[in-house]
Amino acid sequence: MDNQNNNNALANGDSQFTMPKVIDYLQNEWLKFEVDRAHWISEKAELTNRILKLESERKLFESHKFDLCRRVKMLEYALQQERLKNNSLLQQQQKVIEKVEEEEEEDDKIPKNREPPKKSKDNTTRLIIRKYLREMGYNDLIVSKSLQTEFENDSQNIDNDTTNTIDDTNDTTVKTILNLKDINNNNSNNNNKNQTTTTTTTSPSPSPSPSTSTSTSTSSNKTDNTTTTTTNGNGYNSNTIISPPSSSSSSSSSSSSSSSQSQPQPQLQSSLSELINNTTDLSQSLDSLSSASSGYEYDSLLDNLKQLDNSSVSSNSGNNSINSSSDSLDTSKQSQEDPNNVTISKQQQQEQQQQQESDEQSFNSFNEDIFNKLTANSKGRMKIKGLGNLKNYKKEHMGEEGNLSLPDQNTEEKSTPTTKSSSSSSSSSTGSTRKKKSSSSSSSGSSSSNSNTMNSELMGLGASDLNDITLDDGSKGGNDSAAPRVWKFKHSLKSHFDGVRSIQFHPNEPIMISASEDNSIKVWNLNHLVPTKKSPSPEIEPLYTIRGHTGPVFTSEWNQINGEYSNYQSFFSAGYDMIIRQWSLPSSDIDSYLQHGKILPYLEKEFIGGHQDGIWDLLSIPNTPNLLSSSADGTVSLWNTTTSEQLYTLQHSNGLSYIPTSIALPATENNRKLLTSYNDGSILLFDLETQQIISQLKQGSSNNNNNNNNNSQINKIVSHPFMPLAMTGSEDHKIEFFDLNSNTVVHSMIAHSNSISSLTIDPSGLYIASCAHDSSIRFWDISSKTCIQDLNSHRPKYDESIHCIKYHPNKGYFASGGADSVIRILN
């Protein structure tokens, strides 16, 4: 019995520990050990890396410390050297200053026994000149007191002959000074009389005073060496050169020189006063011209030019009257001597008048040329087209002299002579003023004549001709203004690490956001794309990188709760992690380098629990706090963004196996209907108020369960911003146009050589752009359904190329995001 019990126990023990169980147990334990070992190895590697990093940082800090110590020592040494240099320089400067002070003290000391200057002819002549100047009253200005005391002893030792000559010259200088006072008084009276006579009448000039005439005649008859005078154009002596005095003719020469010096003074004073008056008049006219030119008006500018011309004419007439009076004095004198000089002076006056008139005419013609050039070469000048036989119309209404026969010109011509006669009677020189005023009136009338001819030409046209008139800007070069825009590549943004799935432009601010498969959202500043001198195509970094999703981000959308551009201060994003997140928009003024490594609280809300699979598309309903989302779980959900609640869900009539790929709101339905495209190629129109299917625009294919072989899947659906028109891009390379009123297909065309991934409509509603996985972007005219431009963009990656495209709503930007993780900006 005992043996049997032992055998049963062994059998039971063998049944518990069988060979396979033991092997499984050992394998499991071995796997656990290997996993732990792998963890240990990874932790060891991390620790070794950390140790290496800390050691490298320690070495780096030591090198920095050593470098800083070297710099401190170098600066201390340099400071010591500078101090030594400054001390040595200060000592040298003190020594130099002491030497200079000693030299100045030695120079100031005058020796007691100073030798008098040697006698010579130069000293005697200098002494004579100094005594002349003392007696004439220039002692304080020219002769210094030190020189007077210096030569007192020398003046006592001069010879008797020189003293006699000095006494004679002293007597003559006293006499000349007395004569000068009388002559100045006489000349001042005579000049006052001459000025009054020249301003009132043009009578011949009175004869000069008898004293001056006799003195000049005697001086010229006696000797030519005593005085040499040069006559001015006005008949007065301008410069006198005094020769060394002699005993016989000293008195006559001194009197003539003094009279010649005293005569031009009152004439100079009068000419200076006239010159000041003329300059003040001209400055006033210039001020009025500058104040009037600030308005940039043609008529006011011409009026100011006339005033400037008249003021210059008056100033010139004043100068001409003075010059004519002086010329008449000269001619009266010259006529007594030579009759030929009179004819020469008249010819000179005529030539001067002709030059003045030609200058004024050129001035007025210059003004006309300026305004003609301004009107002819202005960039915004509009040309009239469709006038028909305008040349024949001109020929019929042209006169014999080539001018248009207008009724207003005769009245203007009759009124102008009265103004001319009235103005000419007030002026002294009648001929010149008439010509000036006629030239100014012709220049001012050029603009009015041009406007009158234009009005007459338009008045001669009929209503049918006026209907054909079109305004065109000639600077743009003809009929090319209606041509479509040509997009050119400008910039590429390379900051993402995986394919770019969504792009959104801010309507008002220069901001763009991009969502990528690298689990991030980047915010870009478009102002950084402006080219500079250093780099015409700068590589910019994003303002901020938003991280929060745990998977690829497929879509993004602005928060349009108020529907205004200024309120687009937050946006939504969704993707593979089935969560919709709301983010606040970073400001465009932040510095991307200062914010590097910082985590800022831009996340506002999260919408969790609404979907059971990835979210493909988001759509914000304008002017409402509602958001639509389409998911791979087969539902379209409506969310309240203020409370983060899911209001309801929409699904295909055939079940949840039909996955919505894209959604759009028809602009003509006041945001009450929803277009939804599915992976089987069907399109449904939902009513958002009743949550019911209104109509089915397109039937889906039968093989909807086999999604891998389904070529009819619609990847993008868009709605026209102004018309009841919807457009779709699908896997079968087609773009289809649907009429929302009749719910029928209007047009279908094969647009690309590969599946179409996205569509976008121009803000004007005239063009649509499409992108496909054949690496091409094509722009289409909606009315003619023709391709306008084809661009090759983005490199393919794993049978994918371009994921998304977007127009800027206000500015001339176009962006595309591809599988190569690059955003390309077109302009």
From Swiss-Prot:
Coiled coil start-end: 37-109
Biased composition (Polar residues): 337-346
Superkingdom of the organism of origin: Eukaryota
Membrane found in the keyword field: yes
Single GO term (MF): calmodulin binding
Chain intervals with Low complexity compositional bias: 184-270, 311-334, 347-356, 416-432, 439-453
WD repeat start and end residues: 495-534, 548-593, 610-649, 709-748, 751-790, 797-827
Membrane-topology annotation of the record: Peripheral membrane protein
UniProt record similarity statement: Belongs to the WD repeat striatin family.
Protein name: Striatin homolog
Species for this entry: Dictyostelium discoideum
